[in-house]
Amino acid sequence: MITRRQFGQMGLAASALGLCPPRVRAADWQSVLDEANGQTVWWHAWGGDPKINDFIEWLGAEAEVRHGVTINHVKLASTADAVARVLAEQQAGQTEEGAVDLIWINGENFAAMKDKGLLYGPFATELPNWPLVDVAGKPAVVTDFTLPTEGYESPWAMAQLVFEYDTARLPTPPATLAALKDWITAHPGRFTYPQPPDYLGLTFLKQVLYGVMADPTRLQQPVGEGYTADTAPLWAFLDQIHPALWRQSRAFPENEPALGQLLADAETDISLSFNPGRASAEIAAGNLAPTVRTFVLQGGTIGNASFVAIPFNASHRAAAQVVANLLLEPEIQARAQDPNILGFQTVLNLAALPEEDQNAFAGLDLGVATLSPQALGPVLLEPHASWMVKIAEDWQARYGLSK
């Protein structure tokens, strides 16, 4: 059942944000809870990070205790695998009893599912905890790679690109993209990025695009006729740095954990992360040197939100909605922000929370390597999803796949 505390949070949030009361009536949500009790959510989510896997396992225990919902984490190498599964079911005429109940998603995968009618909803704006979401202060929670979410996915974490470095080996990191290029070419083998189409590798390419394009505002529009001219400076930049990358760019790390391990092993001096708290979490776990810190480039770095979405033919829609709402609980958001757990940034409007929840966030030690919100600087909006798709294709055509 809905607790008094939940309704207190909803009322306070609505008042603080100037919103109407949540559209979910108690009876409506109670019927969702009743239906969800005893269901198993098959959550298809990236499984490449042990810390995230542990968090999902912990969340499953919470869902079981609070709502009688079991979470089965289907660990993905690529979100596209889950999208392909749902698409295949749609093409086969399977409109019910789908294999996927919930997907960790954003960007081009959300765009593809929304375009093909593969999503259930809108549901996110109907969740009891939705009024706690910082829609005004964090527009990325309702706009995914320029595409309005329209309630078809629910946010659960914020991310922003940061660079990690070891102060013992690099006292002063480069502050601009041009300075980074100069540093890379002057220090052969000490930098690399994950191999596209890995999301972090593509994020690095998009960050470079922001810095070298004549008119970066074009990134907010779908790829057009000017694409070749727009991206020419990107390929020129990569052509300059690739000979100086780790292993002379004959191989690339597979993903963010593999990239971070290179920094941990002192094989590289500068790394990347899409989680500003990752370095602090790894230091706390003893996996990174205590001298590691983070920095961002002048002018800002790319940021976005992570979401969960429910396929149109999900077998357990009620339980999936319960998990989506649970992810927005303040105490769970605070746990995710703890650098000892994940170090993710919250999607909530902290000013709208009850004092006890505000204190929980305020009491978090974000870690020695985590930049303050002010130091993180401006967030650059994700480009339209079509840029990500086209750049990944062209990167492979130009540089091939490492073996």
Regions picked out by a protein language model, each given a short descriptive name:
Residues 261, 368-403:
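Conserved C-terminal helix/tail region of periplasmic/extracytoplasmic solute-binding proteins
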Residues 29-37, 44, 49-70, 163:
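Short, polar/charged alpha-helical segment
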Residues 246-309, 313, 359:
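Extracytoplasmic/periplasmic substrate-binding proteins
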Residues 1, 19-39:
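C-terminal segment of N-terminal export signals and the immediately downstream linker at the start
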Residues 82, 110, 259-260, 320, ...:
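Short, hydrophobic alpha-helical packing/hinge segments within bilobed ligand-binding/sensory domains
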Residues 46-58, 73-81, 96-257:
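Extracytoplasmic ligand-binding site segments that recognize negatively charged/polar headgroups
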Residues 6-25:
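N-terminal export signals
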